[in-house]
Design a protein with these regions (language model features):
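Structural motif
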Residues: 17, 38, 80-82, 99, ...
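Short connector loops at helix/strand junctions that flank enzyme active sites
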Residues: 32, 74-76, 93-95
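A short, well-structured juxtamembrane/interface segment
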Residues: 21, 87-89
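Glycine/charged-rich beta-loop-alpha catalytic/anionic-binding loops adjacent to active sites
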Residues: 7, 61-62, 93-98
């Protein structure tokens, strides 16, 4: 799982890490295919009701120390998951789209995608130089 911090391994294994309550809730809403879900011993699973629908074989309760090792953040929220990369649909010239080039900050990318979604943009196309 640690290798998924690098873009080449995310591409190779077709997996990525989703971290935090809000992001995992959103992934559930988007019908993400989870490979594994990790949460700290003291994490309140009621915060994400969809966890009740997940195969118990992919859910792992871990110590704070293990969560810190798995997390990409300095202050882990207590839950993270490994999910399959979604299949991208073919470009459709009849739908509105934006093209992004050279976006390297994950926070900026998220803001742009959320804003585009709010404006009804249906396709986001990324250059190879963009963060994935």
């Amino acid at each position: 799982m640690r290798s998924l911090k690098q873009k080449k391994y995310r591409k190779k294994y077709r997996n990525f890490v989703v971290e935090g309550v809000r992001s995992i809730r959103s992934a559930f809403e988007d019908r993400a295919q989870f490979e594994s879900i990790f949460f700290r011993d003291n994490f309140d699973t009621e915060r994400i009701p969809q966890l009740k629908q997940v195969d118990r074989n992919i859910i792992y309760r871990v110590s704070d120390n293990t969560m810190k090792k798995l997390s990409n953040t300095s202050a882990p929220s207590g839950i993270l998951a490994v999910s399959k990369l979604p299949e991208y649909k073919q470009f459709c010239p009849d739908e509105n789209a934006i093209y992004l080039d050279g976006i390297s900050d994950p926070g900026n990318m998220g803001t742009i995608i959320r804003t585009a979604s709010w404006f009804g943009v249906q396709q986001v196309i990324l250059s190879k130089e963009c963060i994935d």
